[in-house]
């Protein structure tokens, strides 16, 4: 109470006293602070019970007033006094000792306001950036301290200054050799090492050298202004009596202390106070985005940034429950790293592990955004660290395990982060993790060359339908990502030489349609090696399912584009025979319903693939290596195998398989279009295409239809139940087959719509 009264009385006296020149006023306030340490004997009283806060505030007011009265960039006498007499160094020492209690908080506030309110650049001054560096080291040492808010405010203003003037970062890239081994002096550092550190020198135009030695007592030397020598001695004695003895700086080389600003921010990201943690994350994001190459290099090589980011990601992943419902992982609300606030009591859709899941996804989102904003060198290093320390070190063992529940949970989490990632550089590392970096054509003998890729593709045909569906969904979303390597690794590298085709020089008679409506080189069930197990008596004639069309190959341009697309569309629409169709009995389920979606999706895919510079037409057969053995690749092999069993698989599995195949068909690459959407491609012996696989399914279907009584009415009833037009009733025999037929019909209509849209887009200028 007495100190507060004294403070009020002092303000009143100052208000009534005649105004002094600014410099005299500034020196007065500073000497008032130093006299406190000389005269006081009570080192336990909090700083708020002294006049120190008001004197510091008045010093700031004077400095701001002085700058406003002068030309921009001109240094006034008060600022000169502050710099020349190393006032910031002294304040740092007092703040480090926290004497009187609460002094550290006052020093942090003073530094923050000084850097924030003074417009002229202060950090280039050695008597500013050196104490700022030292004060940075005090931040984040202990979490949940009373000064945590002031610490983050101070660090953020430093980050803002660096963002404003990126060259200033060089003052905060500390030379790791500045702290020498105690028995060695400056000469212990070789000349070569010193030269290599020039770019990271902390002082403008000064060579790297050891920091000033400490006094015998360990107290850092500070200059308190124009104090008489005896008064300085009294002050030193007072500081020692008040325990204001800064601990000696470490005298050993600290390899990860080059960028203390980063280390302090990293510590504060773990603060229990969410607001502090978010501000620390924002500060790191400012630093990684600085364009200075030296800063990026130091950031990733001389700090623990990469390790701490990825280790936290790993620990949050490991904190997840062993089994989480995949639907919960897929449907949990979108997360944002800056809004990671969750209340279990307020959440009506809570589930076990939701808090842990949101924390993991939020931190992954932060890492993703950090890499997205980072300078390229830093971004690559950060992404590689996530790849090596998290993807390979933590996720891969989970994805490779044999427990079905573990596989399902880990695949669902992989699916979620595939959907969530937005950084191109992190996406690239994720793609390399999932698929590997191989780009040469696959061979059947080497499909397990990249174990994780092989395992994930095998999971698309897993005995567990849930695992199959989840893995197929993951690949479906992966295919939608803007990364050329995904499609090339999974499909395109195996179609590059077009060795799925059989090259036949065109004869004049091949251009004519034969009398019965067949075309030259059309697929024949009896001659197709894939149909040797079907009896000729049980197969349909080609006229019943294949519409007539002239040969259409890229080597022989179409004379009538509209006619060509009409015939190709009809080829898909007529694949399923009339007795197996049910859509025309239900209104609004025609082929045209797929056109709008196909147009939108194809437009989106074209926008993604535009920068990949794909050819507009297939590679000429004369330049293709048609002698090489064709293998469609592990991914298409599994999809085609699944497609071939469409009549015997659950409805949900069939929907997912056809969804992935339709996604592949949408890509505007001529080889993909030819292989998946051209019914009239001349397949080489032993090769199959999507069309030939469907043909075989239809052949099998027509044999099985004849064994089922009331097939068409049952089929229509199942369709209406699936659409919700009929209530659920008694179980229908052959329900899996009937649902498979419905999916097959819809898939053929979807392929027809995609073919139409792609041909229309190709013919439009």
UniProtKB/Swiss-Prot annotation:
Source superkingdom: Eukaryota
Biased composition (Polar residues): 200-209, 538-550
Positions of region (Disordered): 200-234, 538-562
Family to which this protein belongs: Belongs to the FHIP family.
PANTHER family: FHF COMPLEX SUBUNIT HOOK INTERACTING PROTEIN 2A, RAI16 PROTEIN-RELATED
Cited function: May be required for proper functioning of the nervous system.
Name this protein carries in UniProt: FHF complex subunit HOOK interacting protein 2A
Organism: Bos taurus
The gene coding this protein: FHIP2A
């Amino acid at each position: 109470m007495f100190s507060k009264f004294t403070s009020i009385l002092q303000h009143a006296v100052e208000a009534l006293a005649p105004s002094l020149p600014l410099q005299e006023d500034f020196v007065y306030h500073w000497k008032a602070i130093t006299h406190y340490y000389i005269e006081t004997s009570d080192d336990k009283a909090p700083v708020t019970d002294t006049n120190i806060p008001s004197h510091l505030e008045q010093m700031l007011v004077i400095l701001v007033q002085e700058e406003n009265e002068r030309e921009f960039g001109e240094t006034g006498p008060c600022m000169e006094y502050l710099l020349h007499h190393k006032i910031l160094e002294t304040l740092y020492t007092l703040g480090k000792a926290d004497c009187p209690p609460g002094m550290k908080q006052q020093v942090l506030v003073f530094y923050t306001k000084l850097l924030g309110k003074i417009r002229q650049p202060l950090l280039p001054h050695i008597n500013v950036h050196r104490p700022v560096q030292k004060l940075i080291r005090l931040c984040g040492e202990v979490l949940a301290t009373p000064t945590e808010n002031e610490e983050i405010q101070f660090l953020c203003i430093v980050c803002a200054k660096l963002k404003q003037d990126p060259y200033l970062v060089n003052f905060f890239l500390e030379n790791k050799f500045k702290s020498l081994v105690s028995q060695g002096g400056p000469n212990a550092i070789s000349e070569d090492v010193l030269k290599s550190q020039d770019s990271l020198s902390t002082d403008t135009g000064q060579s790297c050298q050891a920091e000033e030695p400490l006094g015998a007592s360990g107290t850092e030397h500070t200059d308190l202004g124009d104090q008489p020598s005896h008064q300085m001695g009294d002050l030193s004695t007072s500081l020692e009596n008040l325990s204001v003895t800064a601990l000696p700086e470490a005298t050993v080389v600290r390899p990860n202390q080059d960028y203390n600003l980063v280390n302090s921010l990293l510590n504060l990201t773990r603060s229990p106070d969410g607001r502090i943690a978010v501000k620390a994350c924002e500060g790191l994001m400012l630093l990684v985005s600085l364009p200075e190459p030296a800063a990026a290099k130091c950031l990733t090589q001389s700090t623990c940034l990469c390790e701490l980011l990825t280790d936290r990601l790993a620990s949050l992943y490991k904190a997840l429950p062993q089994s989480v419902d995949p639907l919960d992982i897929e449907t949990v609300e979108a997360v944002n790293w800056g809004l990671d606030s969750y209340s279990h009591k307020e959440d009506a859709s809570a589930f076990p592990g939701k808090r842990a899941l949101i924390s993991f996804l939020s931190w992954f989102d932060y890492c993703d955004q950090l890499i997205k904003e980072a300078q390229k060198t830093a971004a690559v290093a950060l992404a590689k660290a996530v790849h090596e320390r998290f993807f390979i070190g933590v996720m891969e063992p989970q994805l490779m395990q044999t427990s079905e529940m573990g596989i399902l949970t880990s695949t669902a989490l992989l699916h979620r982060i595939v959907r969530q990632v937005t950084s191109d550089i992190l996406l690239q590392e994720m793609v390399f993790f999932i698929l590997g970096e191989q780009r040469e054509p696959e061979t059947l003998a080497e499909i397990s060359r990249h174990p994780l890729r092989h395992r994930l593709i095998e999971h698309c045909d897993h005995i567990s339908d849930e695992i199959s569906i989840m893995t197929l969904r993951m690949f479906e979303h992966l295919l939608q990502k803007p990364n050329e390597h995904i499609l090339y690794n999974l499909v395109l590298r195996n179609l590059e030489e077009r060795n799925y085709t059989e090259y036949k020089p065109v004869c004049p008679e091949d251009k004519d349609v034969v009398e019965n409506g067949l075309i030259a080189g059309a697929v024949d069930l009896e001659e197709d090696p894939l149909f040797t197990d079907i009896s000729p008596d049980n197969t349909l004639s080609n006229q019943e399912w294949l519409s007539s069309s002239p040969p259409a190959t890229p080597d022989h341009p179409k004379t009538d584009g509209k006619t060509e697309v009409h015939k190709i569309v009809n080829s898909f629409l007529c694949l399923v025979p009339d007795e197996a169709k049910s859509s025309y009995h239900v209104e609004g389920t025609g082929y045209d319903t797929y056109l709008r979606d196909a147009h939108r999706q194809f437009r989106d895919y074209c926008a993604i693939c535009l920068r990949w510079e794909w050819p507009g037409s297939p590679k000429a057969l004369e330049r293709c290596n048609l002698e090489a053995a064709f293998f469609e690749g592990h991914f298409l092999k599994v999809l085609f195998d699944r497609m071939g069993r469409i009549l015997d698989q659950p409805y949900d599995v069939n929907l997912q398989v056809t969804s992935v195949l339709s996604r592949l068909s949408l890509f505007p690459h001529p080889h993909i279009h030819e292989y998946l959407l051209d019914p009239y491609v001349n397949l080489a012996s032993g090769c199959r295409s999507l069309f030939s696989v469907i043909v075989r399914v239809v052949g099998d279907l027509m044999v099985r239809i004849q064994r089922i009584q009331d097939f068409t009415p049952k089929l229509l009833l199942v369709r209406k139940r699936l659409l919700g037009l009929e209530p659920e009733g008694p179980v229908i025999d052959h329900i899996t087959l009937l649902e498979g037929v419905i999916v097959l019909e819809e898939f053929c209509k979807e392929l027809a719509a995609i073919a139409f849209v792609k041909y229309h887009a190709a013919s439009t200028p």
